[in-house]
């Protein structure tokens, strides 16, 4: 005999919300799904070039803990002046 009440609740009309606006409904185990980017505003699907400002995890870690090599930046600047 299978166990009773072990499956999550299924919401056939779950709302997908982007920027406070309901963009679509899908079936899900959550009643609301909040997203930052979806196919309606993604640059690939809309054909627009939009820069999404993200930085790599390593860069963010190095900047956070002050491990960025400052000499490297100075060397790059002096190399650019020589050219």
UniProtKB/Swiss-Prot annotation:
Pfam families noted in UniProt: Ribosomal_L31 (PF01197)
UniProt KW keywords: Ribonucleoprotein, Ribosomal protein, RNA-binding, rRNA-binding
A biological process from GO: translation
PROSITE patterns: RIBOSOMAL_L31 (PS01143)
Transmembrane segments: none
InterPro entries: Ribosomal_bL28/bL31-like_sf, Ribosomal_bL31, Ribosomal_bL31_A, Ribosomal_bL31_sf
tRNA processing among keywords: no
GO cellular component: ribonucleoprotein complex; ribosome
A GO molecular-function descriptor: rRNA binding
HAMAP family listed in its UniProt record: Ribosomal_bL31_1
Family: Belongs to the bacterial ribosomal protein bL31 family. Type A subfamily.
Assembly mode: Part of the 50S ribosomal subunit.
Function recorded in the entry: Binds the 23S rRNA.
Protein name according to UniProt: Large ribosomal subunit protein bL31
Gene designation: rpmE
């Amino acid at each position: 005999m299978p166990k009773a009440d072990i499956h999550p609740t299924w919401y056939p009309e779950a709302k997908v919300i982007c920027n406070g606006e309901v963009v679509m409904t899908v079936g899900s185990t959550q009643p609301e799904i909040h997203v930052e980017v979806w196919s309606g505003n993604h640059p690939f699907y809309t054909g627009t070039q939009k820069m999404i400002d993200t930085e790599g995890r390593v860069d963010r870690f190095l900047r956070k803990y002050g491990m960025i090599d400052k000499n490297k930046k100075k060397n790059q600047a002096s190399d650019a002046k020589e050219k």
